[in-house]
UniProtKB/Swiss-Prot annotation:
Protein name per UniProt: UPF0282 protein LS215_2281
Recorded family membership: Belongs to the UPF0282 family.
Organism expressing this protein natively: Saccharolobus islandicus (strain L.S.2.15 / Lassen #1) (Sulfolobus islandicus)
Domain of life of the native organism: Archaea
NCBIfam families: PRK04286.1-1
Cited InterPro entries: Metallo-B-lactamas (IPR001279), RibonucZ/Hydroxyglut_hydro (IPR036866), UPF0173_UPF0282_UlaG_hydrolase (IPR050114), UPF0282_hydrls (IPR014426)
Amino acid sequence: MKITPIAFESLGVRSQATLIETKDLRVLVDPAISLAPRRYNLPPHQREVDRLTELAKVLVDVAKDVDVIIVSHYHYDHHDPGYVIPTDIYKNKLVFIKDPQNMINNSQKYRRAPRFLRSIKDKPSKIEIADGKTLELGHTTISFSPAVPHGADERLGYVIQVAISDKDSTVIFTSDIEGAPKDVHLKFTKEKMPKTIIIDGPLSYLLGRVLKEEELEKSIRNMEEIVKNGLETVIIDHHVLRDINYAEVLKPVYDIAKDLGVRVTTAAEYLNLEPLILEARRKELFKEDNRPARIPRGLANLLSAGEG
């Protein structure tokens, strides 16, 4: 099995786009890329825009040769109705989606999911609701969790986690569980016993606003439990990498992983690259170069559509 992170915060954008390849299947999870519309009360910097453009091209190129596309929920850094990533990537693909009607918040149920489904209409070879299902495609098994909360607050909606297994190993893609602040977030991992997990980490950059101290502490404790679950590799990236002090936030997890011989890494480091932290450094980027960014129309429309 080969795991290739395509776009993540440690690669300079908001995304969790991941390619997972087994001997007989190529699966693309959450093919979307976004930026924070505002951070430190600043719009995206030109370096962020350039990086998004670069990775969008990579993502579109990767999508040409995949068999399966999975959409874990309807936030714009996980799905795209055509703002930045053209919907032609779904042509002739087997597409698994988060249930657009059940266990979903109102903004996704009544606006985002319907718009997305209209945008890809008649393009996939098949669209299937994935929540709670398991299927075998060749020698590959794909399992989906029932919908679980998008972090500690159900108002942000629900996501599905994904487990992909071949004869040799299993990888879990947690989607946006925000570092697992609820015990229900752990159930799927304990059931599937993966060798590798891709997890987003807590919203520590919003501590005191969206995230409570006790929720952060619970997330860290539960991530420690995940590390103890027989894992070999933990890719922690996405929400927590929006915090410039992410390594300090994750120190308890790193410490336990070191004791157990588990590799904990960002998506960039997994690819043997230095993390390219842009959003968390936006203030610094504008100090270096304060010219307004040239934002393409599609990205401008995406940014005006709102966060998440």
